[in-house]
Each structure stands twice: as structure tokens, then as C-alpha cells.
Amino acid sequence: MVVVMKFFRWVRRAWQRIISWVFFWRQKIKPTISGHPDSKKHSLKKMEKTLQVVETLRLVELPKEAKPKLGESPELADPCVLAKTTEETEVELGQQGQSLLQLPRTAVKSVSTLMVSALQSGWQMCSWKSSVSSASVSSQVRTQSPLKTPEAELLWEVYLVLWAVRKHLRRLYRRQERHRRHHVRCHAAPRPNPAQSLKLDAQSPL
């Protein structure tokens, strides 16, 4: 569980760096866009799409720990209020246990969403940068492919890391699911009746 929380913190920091890097390139290429009025509208449209993808990306936060709601001290509180408070605490603890059991599955979904969003926003960002840089050079120079840029290589490395983490989380979820099924199967098995076992012992020749 600690490893998953550390991973989410690392992903959040990496995504904040990518966002700051996007805004840095935006401020850096503004003079180039102003020097070419023909390509200004096209570049601004792509930039708006990229910023919309970045803004719509939301990380799924881990479920917070359940906190017992204690209104009054035990000395001044009524017995009914204390009983109600203990029941609410037990319900919250049960919900916390269920959320912890569903944590690997939620983490797999959030990592998958993050992978898709990173690919979409990164590809649009690389295409936007290549189109803006092509507007600043002459038409005789051939435009470099977006896949050969350092940004695309960085995006590919981030995607590989997310893919490895997603694979590990899926393996953890499957292991937890097998353990849960085995636990349910053991508790659901019929227990032998002690009266029948005594009769069988009495009928046995030994």
C-alpha cells in the first residue's frame, strides 16, 4: 500500500513538471507565432486543444482514512449517543476495509486513464510544437517528425513506466482476488455435525 501511495506521488510530480514544461514552451514560442500571422490561428487552435486535455486530466485520489465522528466526551454523552457513534464507526471501518480491498482495482483504472491521457496530450503537444517550429523556418527546410523529438522520447519512457506499474498492479489485484475467493470458499464449506461424528465413532469397530 505504501508503494502505491509513493507511486501516485511520483506520478503527480511528473505530471506537474510536464504541465510547467508545456507552459514554458508556450511562453517561449509566443514571439515566433506573432511573427507569422498566417499560421497564428492554426497554432492557437492546437494549443487550446492541448491545454483542454491537460485541464480535463484528473488523477484518482486514494480513499481517505475513515475518521470516527465523536461529538461529546464519554463522561457527558448519553448511552444512546455513544451506541450510535460506535455503530457509525463500525460502518466506516467496514467501508474502509472494502475500499482497501478495491484499491488495486482502482489504481489499475487510474493508471490506465493516465496512460491514455498522457499519450493524447503528449502527441498533441509534440504535433503543436512541430507545427509552430515549421512556421518559423523557410518552406524549403523539411519539418522534423514529431516522433523523433526529445519530448516524444520522454513521453515514451513515461508510458513504459506506467505500463510496468499497471502490470504489477493487475498482478496484485489478481492475487488479492484469489485470496478472497479462497477465504470465502473456506468459510462457506459445511462444517461436520458433532452428533454425527459421535455416532460414526460409536459404530466404528475400533
Curated annotation (Swiss-Prot):
Annotated tissue distribution: Expressed in sperm (at protein level).
InterPro entries: SPACDR (IPR031534)
Protein name: Sperm acrosome developmental regulator
Cellular component GO terms held in the UniProt record: acrosomal vesicle; nucleus
Protein's organism: Homo sapiens
Keywords on record: Cytoplasmic vesicle, Differentiation, Spermatogenesis
Record disease entry: A variant causing a frameshift predicted to result in a premature termination codon has been found in a patient with globozoospermia.
Biological role stated in the UniProt entry: May play a role in acrosome formation and nucleus shaping during spermiogenesis.
Domain of life: Eukaryota
Annotated stretches, region: Disordered: 180-206
Subcellular location: Cytoplasmic vesicle, Secretory vesicle, Acrosome
Pfam families: DUF4703
GO BP terms in the entry: spermatid development
